[in-house]
Curated annotation (Swiss-Prot):
InterPro entries: RNaseH-like_sf, YqgF, YqgF/RNaseH-like_dom, YqgF/RNaseH-like_dom_sf. Could be a nuclease involved in processing of the 5'-end of pre-16S rRNA. Its main location: cytoplasm. One of its GO terms (molecular function) is nuclease activity. It is found in: Cytoplasm. Keywords: Cytoplasm, Hydrolase, Nuclease, Ribosome biogenesis. Coiled coil: none annotated. Its EC number is 3.1.-.-. It comes from the Bacteria. One of its GO terms (cellular component) is cytosol. Belongs to the YqgF nuclease family. This is Putative pre-16S rRNA nuclease.
C-alpha cells in the first residue's frame, strides 16, 4: 500500500462535496462543499484545494440508480471527472456512490441532530464516504 493522498468529490448540480484521504491509513476527512451553478463548479475553488492539498489521485462518486443503471446525473458526474483530468492532469477514478448521502445524513444526525444536517456538511461527509469506500475496495 502506498502513501498517496486522494481527494474525493461528491458531484451535484448545486454543490460538490470534497474530502481528502490517505491511502496509508485508509482514512478520509470532509473538507467542504464547493458551490455549483447547474453542475458547473467554480474551477478556481477546485484549483485552490488541489494546490493546498496536493492529491495524487482524484475519486469522483458516480450516482447510479439502485439497480446499477446510469441516469442523467451519472453522465454529468463522469463529465465532471473527465474535466478534472483535462484541466489539472490528475488521474481520476470513479466510485459507485449509491446511498452515500443517506449514510452521511445518518452519521451527521448521530453527532449533532438536525442542526448538523446543513447541505455543505452532508456533501463533505458524502465525499468522505465515497473515498473510504474506494479505499476499502482497493485494499480490503
Amino acid at each position: 500500500m502506498s502513501s498517496r493522498s486522494i481527494m474525493g468529490f461528491d458531484y451535484g448540480t448545486k454543490s460538490i462535496g470534497v474530502a481528502i484521504g490517505q491511502e496509508l491509513t485508509g482514512t478520509a476527512q470532509p473538507l467542504r462543499a464547493i458551490k455549483a451553478n447547474d453542475g458547473v463548479p467554480n474551477w478556481d475553488d477546485i484549483e485552490k484545494l488541489l494546490k493546498e492539498w496536493q492529491p495524487d489521485l482524484l475519486v469522483v462518486g458516480l450516482p447510479l440508480n439502485m439497480d446499477g443503471t446510469e441516469q442523467e446525473i451519472t453522465v454529468r458526474a463522469r463529465k465532471f471527472g473527465n474535466r478534472l483530468h483535462g484541466r489539472f492532469g490528475k488521474q481520476v477514478e470513479f466510485k459507485d456512490e449509491r446511498l452515500t448521502t443517506t449514510d452521511a445524513r445518518a452519521r451527521l444526525f448521530e453527532r449533532g441532530g438536525y442542526k448538523a444536517l446543513d447541505k455543505g456538511s452532508v456533501d463533505g461527509v458524502s465525499a468522505q464516504l465515497i473515498l473510504e469506500a474506494w479505499m476499502e475496495e482497493q485494499y480490503g
